[in-house]
Amino acid sequence: MNTGFTAIIADDEPLLRHHLDKSLAEVWPELDIVAKVADGEQALLAIEQSQPDIAFLDIRMPVLDGMSLAQKLNRLANPPLIVFVTAYDDYAIKAFEQNAADYLLKPISDARLQTTCERVKARLSQRGSDNSHVQMNSLLEQLQQLSAPQTPQYLQWIKATQGDDIHLIATSDVLYFKAEEKYVSVYAQQGKGEVQEYLIRTSLKELIGQLNPEQFWQVHRSSVVQVSKISKVNKDFAGRMFVYVGETKLPVSRASQSLFKGM
């Protein structure tokens, strides 16, 4: 078997570049990562110079995004196999899964990466097939449809800090967000049910637009809760409403009380 394959990693998140590089070294130690870059233009230059067999491309990158880069690569005589690194939901991914070399959904699990490597190896063994450009064009057309503005893509994970450490938190683990003066606190349930507090620099106003409104409700100007994590709702004698997330009691503004009608 030919083990001399090469690849590049393009992602604007240093933590994700490092994580993918480290994970690839474990599941495919023979693969040579010839470049790790932060945007599409750097990736294009690295690909033209090193002509790798595989390109791991984040779809959302500054300067030149992954999809635009793929269109440019498709004009090359021998384009690399592309593995898109994406935050798309599973239902959207299935629409183009058969045409892509593969995709990786953030945050990337080792088991999923192992499957990706096996699929890529199989595709590499069939290199030179006449329909490679046709498959790439079909993939790009479907990606353009999936990334159209009318199809909202909500956050699946959040990068947050805890002290000097950076963490990737699945939004499904988040209990609630609480705005402070210069940052937003993220309270998430980790491990054996222990609640951990993390910090993010994104404003609550910006964050709420990136969250699924069916899963997260802004109950107050300073707090957003995950609906499925609410244990109870009550009012005091003065008519003030509160929601409980575990043992935490959060106020509900009068404007937001209508969210709980019928509950």
Swiss-Prot record:
Keywords for the protein's UniProt record, in alphabetical order: DNA-binding, Phosphoprotein, Transcription, Transcription regulation, Two-component regulatory system
Name of this protein: Uncharacterized response regulatory protein VPA0021
Pfam family, one: LytTR
Molecular functions per Gene Ontology: phosphorelay response regulator activity; transcription cis-regulatory region binding
Domain Response regulatory, residue spans: 6-121
One cellular component term from this protein's GO annotations in UniProt: protein-DNA complex
Organism, scientific name: Vibrio parahaemolyticus serotype O3:K6 (strain RIMD 2210633)
PROSITE patterns, sorted: HTH_LYTTR (PS50930), RESPONSE_REGULATORY (PS50110)
Superkingdom per UniProt: Bacteria
Limits of the HTH LytTR-type domain: 158-263
Residues carrying 4-aspartylphosphate: 58
Biological process per Gene Ontology, one example term: regulation of DNA-templated transcription
InterPro entries, per the entry: CheY-like_superfamily, LytTR_DNA-bd_dom, Sig_transdc_resp-reg_receiver, WalR-like
